[in-house]
Amino acid sequence: MPTATLKIFLVFGDPKRLRTAELSNWTGKAVAGPRSEFEKVLEREETLNPGVYFLTGIDPDTNKSAIYIGEAESIGDRIKSHLSKDFWNNVAFFISKDENLTKAHIRYIEGRLIEIAKSADRSVVMNSQGSGASSVKRKRKP
């Protein structure tokens, strides 16, 4: 495996608070933070971009780890709509720094992530509907 540099920026100097991460030679960027700093997360310009996001916490019915996986053309607008869901206490999302993700890309990524999360069976997957993976097929080389 080739070497890489992972750059983590601690917005407030605390790894448990708002942070961003970038990997060398990768066009993606990750942003994560606790629900208690939701307003600070929304102030980030990255929330205006399309991407995939994760809401994590504890399922109140089973008391087990829970995750909701979603996609949006505007991360900030979409995650605001999840404020009524009580289970989550952390948010993380991934965007493309070169703005090269289309709706089809993020729907496919969301779908694959949901499939992987369900098959791993390490958390309760809180998504109630199917994913976009089945509607976007991978092209296979002949």
Pin down the residues of each PLM region.
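GIY-YIG nuclease catalytic motif and its immediate N-terminal context
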Residues: 1-69, 73-81, 100, 104, ...
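Structure-specific nucleic-acid interaction/processing domains
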Residues: 49-50, 75-142
